[in-house]
Amino acid sequence: MQTVSDAFDAAYWQARYATPGRAGWDAGRTTPPLRAYFDQLPVAQQPRILIPGAGRAYEAEYLHRLGFRHVVVADLAPEPLAELAARVPDFPKENLWHVDFFALHHREQFDLIIEQTFFCAIDPSLRPAYARQCAALLRPGGKLVGVLFDTAFAGASEPPFGGSREEYRAYFAPYFQFIHFDTAHNSLAPRAGRELFICLQKPAASPAA
């Protein structure tokens, strides 16, 4: 089983979250591309949603306040999960998973996986495994939706790691149909023109099914 890189393990992330200024990609709120997507989701359908590597999980908080009741937050580090529990006391505790995303069993099936700064936080060598695991955890017809950095961070030896849309397309193409895969039009100002908004759908018959 391929798991999170030893270099960026639970202790590494716990230390980063505990050190002021070392989670520089943390926007402090749900970013506009995802907020716009969440606002048009039908609450009545109550999809099962996974947010892996969620960090402080502003997206989970936003979805919870919209009325979504089956949002699962997964993270290697306990600190951000505890922060979410304190910030949103009525968020279901059983949906706060202190776990390695790559170790999640495929019997866990979701309708939607949200990507927000997890892909850029894993060792780039794990990106093919990330795409494969997302597909395995989605029901047929399920979607992977989120934002990816469409820029390189020169000399990066630790997260965040950048990349290009051509690189990303190669990872996801074996498992997903591309509904949307283009520059986000409503990014935060510091990220404008440097983010891709993606909406990828697992086909009814998938190699990761």
Predicted regions and their residues:
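Short catalytic micro-motifs in class I SAM-dependent methyltransferases
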Residues: 117-121
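A conserved beta-strand element that flanks and buttresses the S-adenosyl-L-methionine
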Residues: 114
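Class I (Rossmann-like) S-adenosyl-L-methionine-dependent methyltransferase catalytic domain
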Residues: 1-51, 55-108, 122-209
